[in-house]
Amino acid sequence: MDFAIRPVRDDDTKDLVQLSLLAWAPVFPSFKQMLGDGIYGLIWPDWRASQREAIEQVCKDGDQTTVYVAELDGTAVGFIAYVLNLKDKTAEVQLLAVHPDHQNLGIGTALNAYALNRMKESGVTLARVDTGGDPSHAPARRCYEKAGYTALPLVRYFKDLTER
């Protein structure tokens, strides 16, 4: 499969929103099952709206966020977004998504490698990414481990203070 990786364009936003909603659809039911309806509803009352807003923000935030798109036959099939902190020589991957029809074909791996090379060319010495520890994030963890990231297990706790 021959795909190209290129910088995001203004006309990509709508496609990247749709792609990300499909790619992350399995994640939110997993979160809901783990957290329960109460806490889940407090964090993500409408996960689709939250994701749409996040994607729209990174696509228009060219001064702060770098976004690259994987394109196959003129169609966006994946993307990666990261932020550079040149003062600290660090970078953080904020988002990585591959359309479900194109997952497990090396697109996420290629996007990671491409972004890591651009980071290194910018003088970055340390890259980081956060991802979930739940079963729905297993493919993401494999992708990051394949790219050479080292995991630091963390636990995040939530407490619903609206309960009596």
Task: List PLM regions with ranges.
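Acetyl-CoA-dependent GNAT
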Residues: 3, 7-94, 99, 112, ...
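Basic/polar N-terminal segments that are highly enriched at the extreme N-terminus
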Residues: 1-2, 164
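Conserved active-site alpha-helix within GNAT-family acetyltransferase domains
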Residues: 109, 125, 133-153
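Short coil/turn segments at alpha/beta junctions that flank glycine-rich nucleotide-binding fingerprints
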Residues: 105, 122-125
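Short polybasic/polar patches that bind polyanions
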Residues: 103, 120, 145
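Terminal substrate-recognition subdomain of acyl/acetyltransferases
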Residues: 146-147, 155-164
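Conserved beta-strand-loop-alpha-helix junction that forms the acyl-donor binding cleft
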Residues: 103, 128-140, 158-162
